[in-house]
């Protein structure tokens, strides 16, 4: 016959106090974490009037659209966010959290989408985002922004397109019914491609001076024509269009980025400084092509635009 289990011993007073303290600490920490998460969610979901799917043009029968977010207390200034990664663009790229710091500072945000490669070449994509800038400028009064004080922001391919706007934007032919310039007043970019003629250090470098190995169709390089590529690469490289007219530019780049090496940003900065331009490069130590603290740099970018626009 099995013996009855011994009765449970009550906790000693010291152990009881320790257990109670640990429980209270756990509850406090859990409450603090919940409060932090709630505050973070609220911060990145500010109240704003949103217009989605505003058509600014078309390509190959496909409508080209942008979204507009207007804060309750708009400051009359606009930020254009080029939504692009790998020169592909869609609403499912999780971009809206990036707009929050700008909306909270009173900026009207225009999120520009383009037809993705390979359906459109990078040259065509640049033409389309330029068209979006002119579209916004032509309707600036309707949107409550100053057409001469637009900022642009983008990362990776979006950063490349943003720098093309900063270096090559200007008065355009009125083929689309507008004569508004497509140049911006200031630019913030993350890990941008700046020089397609020299991809040294990139995992996309084919080693023969040709186009990025996984983006040949995007540059209309199938089959590869090296002579034609050199011309295209130079035309689509912001580095080769730096002049003293370059608007103030802020660059964030991880020093361990292997897709777009930091040398791309360093060489752009050096060329801009030589031309007498205001370009700042912020190096994110130990970071690759993306990093966890990027939201903090977006907040920093919003403050930087305050001083530039």
Per-region residue spans from a language model:
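Short beta-strand/loop motif that positions the catalytic acidic residue
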Residues: 245, 251-253, 257
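Conserved alpha/beta-hydrolase "acid-adjacent" motif
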Residues: 258-267
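Catalytic nucleophile-loop/oxyanion-hole region of alpha/beta-hydrolase
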Residues: 55-56, 90-92, 98, 110-147, ...
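Primarily recognizes the serine-hydrolase "nucleophile elbow" in alpha/beta-hydrolase
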Residues: 134-204
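Mobile cap/lid helix-loop segments that gate and shape the active-site cleft of serine hydrolases
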Residues: 59, 198-241
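Catalytic active-site module of serine/aspartate enzymes centered on a nucleophile-bearing elbow/loop
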Residues: 295-309
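N-terminal cap/lid segment of alpha/beta-hydrolase-fold proteins
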Residues: 37-73
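Short beta-strand element of the alpha/beta-hydrolase
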Residues: 75-86
């Amino acid at each position: 016959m099995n013996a009855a289990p011994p009765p449970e011993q009550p906790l000693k007073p010291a152990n009881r106090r320790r257990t109670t303290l640990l429980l209270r600490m756990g509850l406090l920490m859990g409450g603090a974490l919940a409060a932090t998460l709630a505050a973070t969610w609220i911060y990145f979901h500010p109240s704003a009037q949103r217009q989605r799917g505003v058509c600014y043009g078309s390509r190959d029968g496909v409508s080209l659209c942008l979204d507009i977010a207007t804060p309750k207390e708009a400051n009359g200034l606009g930020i254009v966010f080029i939504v692009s990664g790998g020169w592909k663009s869609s609403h499912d790229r999780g971009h809206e959290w990036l707009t929050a710091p700008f909306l909270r500072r009173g900026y009207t945000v225009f999120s520009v989408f383009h037809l993705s490669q390979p359906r459109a070449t990078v040259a065509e994509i640049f033409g389309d985002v330029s068209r979006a800038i002119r579209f916004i400028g032509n309707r600036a009064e309707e949107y409550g922004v100053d057409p001469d004080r637009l900022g642009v922001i983008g990362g990776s391919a979006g950063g490349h397109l943003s720098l093309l706007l900063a270096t090559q934007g200007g008065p355009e032919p009125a083929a689309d019914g507008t004569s508004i310039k497509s140049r911006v007043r200031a630019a913030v970019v993350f890990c941008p491609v700046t020089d397609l003629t020299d991809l040294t250090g990139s995992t996309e470098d084919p080693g023969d001076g040709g186009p990025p190995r996984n983006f040949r169709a995007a540059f209309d390089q199938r089959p590869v024509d090296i002579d034609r590529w050199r011309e295209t690469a130079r035309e689509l490289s912001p580095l080769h269009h730096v002049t003293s007219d370059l608007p103030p530019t802020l660059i964030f780049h991880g020093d361990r980025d292997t897709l777009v090496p930091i040398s791309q940003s360093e060489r752009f900065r050096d060329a801009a400084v030589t031309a007498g331009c205001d370009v700042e490069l912020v190096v994110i130590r130990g970071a690759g092509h993306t990093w966890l603290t990027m939201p903090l740099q977006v907040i920093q970018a919003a403050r930087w635009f305050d001083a530039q626009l």
